Design a protein with these regions (language model features):
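Class I SAM-dependent methyltransferase Rossmann-like catalytic core
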Residues: 1-43
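Conserved SAM-binding loop of SAM-dependent methyltransferases across substrates and taxa
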Residues: 52-65
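Conserved SAM/SAH-binding beta-strand->alpha-helix loop
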Residues: 74
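S-adenosyl-L-methionine
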Residues: 83-113
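A short SAM/SAH-binding and catalytic strip from SAM-dependent methyltransferases
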Residues: 110, 116-135
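Conserved beta-strand signature within the Rossmann-like core of class I S-adenosyl-L-methionine
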Residues: 120-121, 141-144, 148-162
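Charged, low-complexity C-terminal accessory regions
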Residues: 162-242
């Protein structure tokens, strides 16, 4: 879904592969959250926008659906997604279609092509600030995407902020401090500061312009992601039901 120099290309996939142990606590936290969101869904199809190779996609969650359709602009994403998840999905009877395509270039047509599917944005909305020419344009595009999804079941996990940490938190093992989690929008500065302080965040942290993706009626879950030992991302997750 993103240009290869952002979250695609050979180096990105190599980095994701070698970071599996570091990322595992976040993947496990997201798996629990995702299963909770779709346990009562009536949709049998899932569309993943910005799927990459599914490095953080829990296979057991994917197997809940009869169809999985992935979209990503990175030409390596589709074959690597099939390599990582294809066999298990086939064994489960889940049909997998992986397309190399910019799904956001014509989102209305994609929604019409998959009228009953759940739509999931896999860490893509927070990257739009890097692919657009300015902050205002990125914010406008995010708002237009959200408007386009009215009446649909959809979810997103995306970067809310990212930045350096002082490395004091222990990495590895089963330590719950590895992956701090907290519900709520955290839209008040004091709440955000408390959250960032809990992971020893060091200024400056980058705002990914996703603070208004979800309205106040949508339950939001926050998860930290140790992208690198000394550089973490604050992930915001939410699921919208029609």
């Amino acid at each position: 879904m993103l240009p290869p120099n952002v979250t695609g290309g050979l180096f990105w996939h190599w980095q994701a592969w070698r970071s599996a142990a570091l990322w595992r606590p976040t993947v496990e936290a997201l798996e629990f959250w995702l299963k909770l969101q779709t346990k009562d869904t009536r949709s049998e199809a899932l569309v993943i926008i910005g799927a990459s190779a599914g490095w953080m996609m829990p296979i057991d969650w994917l197997c809940q659906f009869k169809e999985v359709h992935t979209f990503d602009i990175d030409p390596l994403a589709a074959p690597l997604f099939r390599w990582r998840h294809g066999k298990k999905l086939r064994q489960n009877g889940t049909a997998l279609t992986c397309l190399t395509q910019n799904a956001l270039s014509d989102l209305p047509s994609l929604l019409k092509a998959h009228p009953q599917a759940c739509i999931f944005f896999d860490n893509v909305l927070g990257q739009l600030r890097f692919t657009e020419s300015g902050v205002q344009l990125a914010e406008k595009n995010i708002s237009q995407i959200v408007q386009c999804l009215k009446g649909r079941e959809w979810g997103s996990v995306h970067d809310r902020m990212s930045g350096p940490v002082n490395g004091a938190l222990k990495l590895g093992g089963d330590d719950k401090a590895l992956c701090p989690e907290r519900p709520g929008h955290l839209d008040k500065s004091v709440d955000a500061q408390t959250w960032l302080s809990s992971i020893n965040a060091q200024s400056p942290w980058l705002d990914h312009l996703t603070g208004n993706v979800f309205d106040k009626n949508t339950a939001v879950h926050n998860v930290d992601w140790a992208f690198k030992p000394n550089y973490w991302h604050w992930l915001q997750a939410g699921w919208v039901r029609p």
